[in-house]
Amino acid sequence: MLTKTGTSELVAIAGGSASDDANHISGPSRTGDGLYFAMRDAMSEAGVGPADVDMLQMHGTATAYNDEMESKAAGLAGLSDVPAQSLKPYFGHTMGASGIIETILAAEELKRGIFLGVKGFEELGVPVPLNVSAENRLITNPHHCLKTASGFGGTNAAVLLSFGTPAPASAKKTSSALNPVRRVQISQGQVNVDETSAFVSSQTDFHTFSREAFKSREEANMKFYKMDDLCKLGYLASAWLLDGIEYGEEECGIVMSGKYGCLDTDIRHQQIIDSEGDSSASPAVFVYTLPNVVAAEISIRHHIKGENIWFWSEDKTMSDIKKYASILAASRDLKYCIAAHIDFINGDYFAIFELLENTDR
């Protein structure tokens, strides 16, 4: 059982964080720094140091680049000697469900003091050593397990689970005052920046509008044309939003929302499978069947490695996600946070992006 307030009988989610590699839409960072940031911040939020971690449960896809990245992140976090595992050899990669399934099992491992061996493991194939074993291990009186996950868009997440000891009370501020710096709205072939027209297309249909808007920016990023329409919309809005804005790679976060998410691309992906069979499924389309990939494309373009998150919401005023943005700004000491509502479905498109500055910093 998981709870936000640890007791002697329950496993607590004592800390958590997310980050982005800002590197590649489908390939992991080669340095491991993005995942390390999430691991570091999850431990910090829980008031736990590397020496206090008893178990390390990694994403562990058994692919060369991912495992290399994870080993480097664990090394940067000071966790190379902590017993480490991946549970995917037992039940495969359950895609979006893998994080929650494996977190539940991590909680059970903490309670039982049994750390499962990595099924099929024979030898390390990573550049930074990890404490991996094929055998189950008994761990006496374990208190803390760090669980990580990574996904498309270079998204990383980490949670620090605690058992048998209450999470320490945080002395950090719970929210920050945020001041609006700039607002961008896109709809009907037009880009408005702070109520002033910044670009008007000759056509309102999205394909014509997006091409003309992108060309007007005079950018040389040809990867724009490979993106799905939702990501193109977010990419364009962020381009005008962040013009001339300076920040460190960890000083900006992204909080996004929408009603439809990636549904338009989900439908297109399924139509390919229905008409041509499973073997014709396009990796170039599949990678965009997650709404967080919008934030990933923005992060790659603008070198943002701070925390990002997606919420399902119909609130175009963004009153709900702005509250979360203020919490995020305080907990991660952000200089800026992007709050955005974005939707694309059946050719209809709408985006509002606001850049919020942390005035308590």
Model regions and ranges:
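Short, structured beta-strand segments at or near domain termini in extracellular proteins/domains
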Residues: 1-4, 160
